[in-house]
Amino acid sequence: MIFILIVIIIALFIYQLFLMNKINKTRREMGGLPIATPFPQHQRLPLSQKRNPIVVVSTTCTVCQRLFKEYNNKTHGDKITFAFVDDTSTVTQFLKQHPQMTSASVVSFYDRDQLFVKNTPLAYILNSEGYVVDKQSIVSLKELPINS
C-alpha cells in the first residue's frame, strides 16, 4: 500500500515538472508585441527585409552572442534582420568588433519599450503589410522560418 502511494506521489511530481516546464515556455514566448499588431516603424526597414524574420537582439545577451557567431552571410545572407535594442553608438562599436556581421541587415532605431521586449533574443515573423503573424524565443538561427 505504501509502495503504491509513493509511486503515485512520484508520478504526480513528474507530471508537475512537465506541466510547469510547458507553462514557463509559454510565458517566455508571450513577451513582446502581440500577434496581429503592426510592427513599429515597419516602413523604415529596407524593402528587401520586410518579409524576413526580425530577430530582436542585444549586444550584452549571451544567447545573442551565439546567434552572432552562428550567422553566416552565405547561408543567411539578407534573409534575417537583426534589430538591436541598444543605442546606436554601442551597435556601431559592436559591429566593428564582429566583422562577420558587417554584411548583415542591422537596424538600431528600436528600444525595448517600443517592442515590449524584456528578454532577447525574440524573433518576429511579419506578413507583407508589416503585421506580426508569429513570434518565438530562439536559441539558434536554425529555428527561424527563412524564405529561400
What are these regions (language model features)?
Residues 40-44, 102-111, 136-137:
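Short acidic-hydrophobic, aromatic-tinged amphipathic segments that line or gate anion-handling sites
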Residues 109-148:
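Thiol/disulfide oxidoreductase modules built on the thioredoxin-like
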Residues 68-73, 91-95, 145:
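Short amphipathic alpha-helical segments and helix-helix/interface helices
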Residues 78-109:
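Thiol-based oxidoreductase modules, predominantly thioredoxin-like and allied folds used
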Residues 44-74, 78-83:
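Short active-site neighborhood of thiol/selenol oxidoreductases, capturing the structured segment around
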Residues 59-64, 88-89, 139-141:
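Short acidic, S/G/P-rich loop/turn micro-motifs used as interaction or catalytic elements
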